[in-house]
């Protein structure tokens, strides 16, 4: 049995030795052994000790006999291993340095055992090669192949059951890498195509510019050549004329000479002298003319040289213009790319806005269907709480829950708002009531809103105001009650709303609770009814923009003003939000368009565009955040840069109710006199408010609206929206703006 066991051990050792002998030389060199131990995470000192123990003949290589003798001795256990005649086993009874040798022997044995276990019959190197062969050409996509192969061999040695999952992981990685490489190639091809297209466009532009330059150069040369030829032809004609005159003079002189020969000298001496004098004078005149002609020729030559220099300068300027045009082309391409990015972002925002709008309309339609299923008309359902109207009594419109006698009165007021035509006049006359919009932020320009207002005028008259009116009708993007045409409603509709009574009893479960609080500075109801009759004919909407850093409470301020509500966790404004509010300013009914801008840095450019046509600005800061107060100067500079004229500004210190609490907690707060000084510096109004308890909200808006009305009365050319009804027409400039 012992012999059979030794035979099996020798067979295993032979397979292990064959796996370690990579070059099939029958000998393990020192470098091969070190590389094998490095892959197996064996310390270099232990690897050297194991090699020295196995290398019995000290020839620098291990044969199979030495390998088998050393490992058989370690596998048989104990301290009785036969290490050969050159290295006898150490004595157990001795102390001192021999104990240290014994510890080294144990370390060598552990390293040898690890080597024997790792290089078992399974042959991890061969398994890795087989796996690579199965992969085929995909093996070249393996990143860091050496580390992957080492981990593969270690897993094969420690836990062979994990080999198959590991192979699946490697295949998945290879598949992903191939996909990534394919995508990178496609991207490279697309980039190359774009570059080629840009190069073609640039080359076409260069060719066009070259053609234009050549045409201009040819035209200039042709003109200069024509002018030079004309000048030379003039000079040639003058020269020929003068030569002809000289020839005629010479002929005359010859004739006179012949005549003088024929006549006697005594008779003609005086005449000849006179003729000679005349001819000499004429000769001098001709010489003078010749000199002038030569001077003109020199002057024309200098002009020709100047034209040549001008032509050279124009050529240089043309080259410079070409360089500038190339730079402009590059800038234009960059701007086009930026515009495409902005258009993509704008489309995404519009898509999200449409999705939110459709979700809101679906929710309202589901609510209406549930009402029809339960045989409950929308007219008997409370949509939202509103201030109480009591006929034509002269009591004030104050919103006080303690003054209500029962839930039935509150339900009656709420049910009166279900009729869209009656609800419009009701909401306009009540100061603390909200002017609803979609509730969604929008990035549209105010001019687009004017076009939709005209469309809403036409559509609002066609809606029935009976029981069939659904809540989805007021959930459109710009279906704001205050924008509807109020002139067609008349005072009779106002009276009908004030005299409206419920058709049936309303349960307590239908009453909607809210966090609304009473707002001060309200006018009596009778005054509002009288103001309705005066303001139907001429009603203007003033554009008020809310600005300030993020999280200063602009949306809460607007919600408290329009809806008389306060919500703790309100979402941040994306882009711009819009509300309408009607106030009584100096006894006149005034409609305000309130634009809530986002305070984040990425929306600053959008907010800046709304300052251009703003009639007034509510500039908010947080009294518990000093940074928002320090940024007020930057906001004021932005408003002054965007607005063409001086815009009234109301500086509002919000969150005044929590300033003392924040100060006790150690936060750096902004005192009230700091805000007053800053407002005096810029000539602005100042007020501290609290959107949570509603203090000074309406007062701040009233003061700003009063200042806006004063400014607009002095300057009628301000950009305001005329809401006088269907009889009023838009100005040509507004039509061109909306229809362009």
Swiss-Prot record:
InterPro entries in the record: EF-hand-dom_pair, EF_Hand_1_Ca_BS, EF_hand_dom, P-loop_NTPase, Rab, Small_GTP-bd, Small_GTPase
GO biological process, one term: vesicle-mediated transport
Biased composition (Acidic residues): 101-110
Listed GO MF terms: calcium ion binding; GDP binding; GTP binding; GTPase activity; identical protein binding
Tissue: Down-regulated in cutaneous melanoma cells but not in breast cancer cells.
Ranges that cross the membrane: none
GO cellular component: cytosol; perinuclear region of cytoplasm
Residues annotated for Ca(2+) 1 binding in this entry: 21, 23, 25, 27, 29, 32, 61
Coiled-coil region(s): 175-356
Compartmental location: Cytoplasm, Perinuclear region
Biased composition (Polar residues): 376-386, 719-740
Region ranges (Disordered): 82-110, 376-403, 713-740
Reported impact of residue 600 to L: Favors GTP association
Domain EF-hand: 8-42, 42-77
Residue sites binding Ca(2+) 2 per the record: 55, 57, 59, 66
Primary location: cytoplasm
Annotated positions of the Phosphoserine modification: 377, 383
Binding positions (GTP): 551-556, 654-657, 691-692
Keywords: Calcium, Coiled coil, Cytoplasm, GTP-binding, Metal-binding, Nucleotide-binding, Phosphoprotein, Repeat
Family, per entry: Belongs to the small GTPase superfamily. Rab family.
Record function comment: Binds predominantly GDP, and also GTP. Acts as a dynein adapter protein that activates dynein-mediated transport and dynein-dynactin motility on microtubules.
Assembly behavior: Homodimer. Interacts with the dynein-dynactin complex.
Stated name of the protein: Ras and EF-hand domain-containing protein
């Amino acid at each position: 049995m012992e012999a059979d066991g030794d035979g099996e051990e020798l067979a295993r050792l032979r397979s292990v030795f064959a796996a370690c002998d990579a070059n099939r030389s029958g000998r393990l060199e020192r470098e091969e052994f070190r590389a094998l131990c490095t892959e197996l995470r064996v310390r270099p000192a232990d690897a050297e000790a194991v090699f020295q123990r196995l290398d019995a003949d000290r020839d620098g290589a291990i044969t199979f006999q030495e390998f088998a003798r050393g490992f058989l001795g370690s596998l048989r256990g104990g301290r009785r291993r036969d290490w050969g005649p050159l290295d006898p086993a150490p004595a157990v009874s001795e102390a001192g340095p021999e104990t240290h040798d014994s510890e080294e022997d144990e370390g060598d044995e552990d390293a040898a055992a690890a080597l024997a276990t790792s290089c078992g019959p399974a042959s991890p190197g061969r398994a890795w090669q087989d796996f690579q062969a199965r992969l085929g050409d995909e093996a070249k996509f393996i990143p860091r192949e050496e580390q992957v192969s080492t981990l593969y061999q270690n897993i094969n040695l420690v836990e062979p059951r994990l080999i198959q999952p590991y192979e699946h992981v490697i295949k998945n990685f290879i598949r992903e890498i191939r996909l990534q490489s394919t995508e990178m190639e496609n991207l490279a091809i697309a980039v190359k195509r774009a570059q080629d297209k840009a190069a073609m466009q640039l080359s076409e532009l260069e060719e066009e510019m070259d053609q234009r330059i050549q045409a201009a150069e040819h035209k200039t040369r042709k003109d200069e050549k024509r002018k030079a030829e004309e000048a030379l032809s003039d000079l040639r004609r003058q020269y020929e004329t003068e030569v002809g005159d000289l020839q005629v003079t010479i002929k005359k002189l010859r004739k006179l000479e012949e005549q003088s020969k024929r006549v006697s000298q005594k008779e003609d001496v005086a005449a000849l002298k006179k003729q000679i004098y005349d001819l000499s004078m004429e000769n001098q005149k001709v010489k003078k003319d010749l000199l002038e002609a030569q001077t003109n020729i020199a002057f024309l030559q200098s002009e020709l040289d100047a034209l040549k220099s001008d032509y050279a300068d124009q050529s240089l300027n043309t080259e410079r213009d070409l360089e500038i045009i190339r730079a402009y082309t590059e800038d234009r391409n960059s701007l086009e790319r930026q515009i495409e990015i902005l258009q993509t972002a704008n489309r995404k925002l519009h898509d999200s806005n449409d999705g939110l709008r459709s979700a809101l309309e679906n929710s309202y339609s589901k609510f209406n269907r549930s009402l029809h299923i339960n045989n409950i008309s929308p007219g008997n359902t409370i949509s939202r709480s509103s201030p109480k109207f009591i006929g034509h009594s002269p009591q004030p419109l104050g919103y006080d829950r303690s003054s209500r006698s029962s839930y039935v009165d509150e339900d009656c007021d709420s049910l009166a708002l279900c009729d869209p035509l009656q609800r419009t006049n009701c909401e306009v006359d009540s100061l603390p009531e909200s002017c609803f919009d979609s509730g969604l932020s929008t990035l549209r320009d105010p001019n687009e809103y004017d076009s939709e207002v005209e469309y809403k005028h036409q559509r609002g008259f066609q809606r029935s105001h009976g029981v069939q009116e659904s809540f989805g009708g007021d959930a459109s993007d710009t279906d704001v009650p205050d924008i509807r045409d109020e002139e067609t409603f008349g005072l009779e509709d106002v009276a009908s709303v004030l005299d409206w009574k419920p058709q049936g009893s309303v349960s307590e479960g239908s009453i909607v609770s809210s966090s609304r609080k009473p707002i001060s500075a309200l006018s009596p109801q009778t005054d509002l009814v009288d103001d309705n009759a005066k303001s139907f004919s001429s009603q203007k909407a003033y554009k008020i923009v809310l600005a300030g850093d993020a999280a200063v409470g602009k949306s809460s301020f607007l919600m408290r003003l329009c809806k008389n509500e306060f919500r703790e966790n309100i979402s941040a404004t994306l882009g711009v939000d819009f509300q309408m509010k009607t106030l009584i300013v100096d006894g006149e009914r005034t409609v305000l368009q309130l634009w809530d801008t986002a305070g984040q840095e990425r929306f600053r450019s959008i907010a800046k565009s709304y300052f251009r046509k703003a009639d007034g600005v509510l500039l908010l800061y947080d009294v518990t955040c000093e940074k928002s107060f320090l940024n007020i100067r930057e906001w004021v500079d932005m408003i002054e840069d965007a607005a063409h004229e001086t815009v009234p500004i109301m500086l509002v210190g919000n969150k005044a109710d929590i300033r003392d609490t924040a100060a006790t907690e150690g936060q750096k707060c902004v005192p009230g006199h700091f805000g007053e000084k800053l407002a005096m510096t810029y000539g602005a109004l100042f007020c501290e408010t609290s959107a949570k308890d509603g203090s000074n909200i309406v007062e701040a808006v009233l003061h700003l609206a009063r200042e806006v009305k004063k400014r607009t009365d002095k300057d009628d050319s301000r950009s305001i929206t005329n809401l006088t009804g269907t009889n009023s027409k838009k100005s040509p400039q507004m039509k061109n703006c909306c229809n362009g």
